[in-house]
């Protein structure tokens, strides 16, 4: 198909500086060919970079934050799994780790933080409080989990979850990133 477009056809009279009639079709087909040739290897490289350099933002309201701190320490060293502890802007983070109870008053703020993160963005709900409301599930002001406010990619159960469980959740998130197609 590309050869047909590139082959010289009957000479049409055109004024100098004008493009041939099939120029736009040629550019469109050429871009399709390039996208097909580059899409898979480039997508693999970009997903590889994403899965080994997740920048988390923490929403800490309960004891799960202590376990995340333990996972970041030298014994478990969560950085070897690509969770980079960097302190920057929300617009640089691509992973939100929600740890603890989320109240109705906090829900708009959680959504605002999520909306400020760049695409692709991922969410880990860590602990029973973030997943189901925890001990305060029947309180009038506590949300029964954050999945009603923002989409959750990985649930890490426990009260509080052990660092090993958090690492397993990070590995599950990496598997999900591997399976997604680069956009």
Which residues make up each language-model segment?
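Iron-sulfur (Fe-S) cluster-binding modules
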Residues: 1-89, 117-121, 137, 142-143, ...
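Gly/Ser/Thr-rich loops at beta-strand to alpha-helix junctions
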Residues: 65-67, 101-105, 130-132, 161-164
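Short, basic, glycine/proline-bearing loop/turn elements
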Residues: 71, 92-100
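Metallocofactor- and cofactor-centric catalytic cores in central/energy metabolism, strongly enriched
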Residues: 2, 80, 98, 102-107, ...
